[in-house]
């Protein structure tokens, strides 16, 4: 069974346009079937993750993608590079970075706005658990659309986030037993001074899904969660 690892958006502008949304190149490292490397001028962190972290289908609500696009995850289309290991026993690991590389800032310098994610994961046919460390530099705020206004106003600070994810699904689809995806994020900000500034924020997500209930490829889902606050 394929796991959804993307989200489609509709363009509603009035002018004709042709643009490249994502582009990258992935190659094995040496002759290895377990190690790979990715580089691209337009890529997001999660395309380079070691494993899919959620089986809840986001539908119309992108905030529920990847078990909640909150502290550690979020839209991040920039220049990126990463490495990934996927073992035969279910263990997988990845480390990748995307950088805005704005003019004069350089790559991974103190002035550069970048996001570096490292994941450890264990996945079997029916379940998955993972932990991701996200190091965000120079006011990176890809979490902003799933957070309270107070969290978004993080005063040009660096941040460190952790994302725990897990899912489980029954052996057979189309039954009354739902598949379940859960997520919990915590993010802490460096340098936020003053009593009205957020030092730490958390979020959570729970999604239940019933695939193939009436016919193949249909889906019934219920998802709820708390934005970063």
Identify the residue ranges that each predicted region occupies.
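Detector for outer-membrane/organellar transmembrane beta-barrel domains
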Residues: 89-90, 94, 111, 121-229
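Extracellular loop and loop/strand-boundary signature of outer-membrane beta-barrel proteins
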Residues: 8-11, 65-69, 103-106, 147-153, ...
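Charged, low-complexity surface patches
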Residues: 14, 109-110
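Active-site substrate-binding loop specific to GH73 endo-beta-N-acetylglucosaminidase modules
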Residues: 115
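Outer membrane beta-barrel
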Residues: 1-102, 121-125, 205-229
